[in-house]
């Protein structure tokens, strides 16, 4: 409601499990108008062999990983690699900034109950395969008894949602003002 001009597409809104590939395809199939932007935010819970692992973190694609984000059919082949490299660098910077804003939002909401594990880079399937700025959020560990209780609490989940929302709002405001 706060962003009536923004489209929000949920890959799921009930207890179903689309494959990671389905989620990526759904995101990549969104048609943008001129001057429209798109972000991909994937929300997960973590697991570990250690029951002591705890905390929230936000992941982005490492800058050294290169993907094709510009469709070869849409630009002359002479400039494709240059344009693709420029877009990929822009997407990487936006992903890092979005990750930090979301992490800050989560830290403000849940940082007293769960450790902040920071922003991190890795080639997770969803951030590697979407053609847009993207992050993967891990809200806590289902292998940790304390965090299971938190993640089953509606109040805690509302705080997680508010933290993500506040982080995205800060990112969007900064992005639109610059």
Named regions from a protein language model:
Residues 1-178:
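Active-site-proximal helix/loop segments of hydrolytic enzymes
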């Amino acid at each position: 409601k706060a962003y009536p001009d923004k489209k929000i597409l949920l890959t799921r809104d009930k207890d179903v499990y689309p494959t990671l590939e389905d989620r990526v395809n759904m995101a990549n199939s969104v048609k943008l108008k001129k001057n429209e932007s798109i972000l991909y935010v994937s929300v997960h819970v973590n697991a570990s062999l250690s029951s002591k692992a705890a905390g929230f973190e936000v992941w982005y694609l490492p800058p050294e990983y290169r993907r094709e984000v510009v469709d070869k059919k849409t630009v002359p082949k002479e400039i494709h690699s240059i344009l693709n490299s420029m877009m990929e660098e822009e997407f990487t910077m936006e992903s890092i900034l979005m990750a930090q804003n979301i992490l800050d939002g989560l830290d403000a909401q849940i940082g007293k109950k769960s450790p902040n594990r920071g922003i991190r880079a890795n080639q997770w399937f969803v951030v590697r395969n979407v053609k847009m700025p993207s992050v993967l959020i891990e809200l806590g560990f289902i292998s940790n008894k304390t965090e299971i209780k938190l993640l089953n609490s509606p109040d805690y989940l509302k705080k997680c949602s508010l933290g993500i929302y506040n982080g995205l709002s800060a990112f969007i405001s900064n992005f639109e003002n610059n």
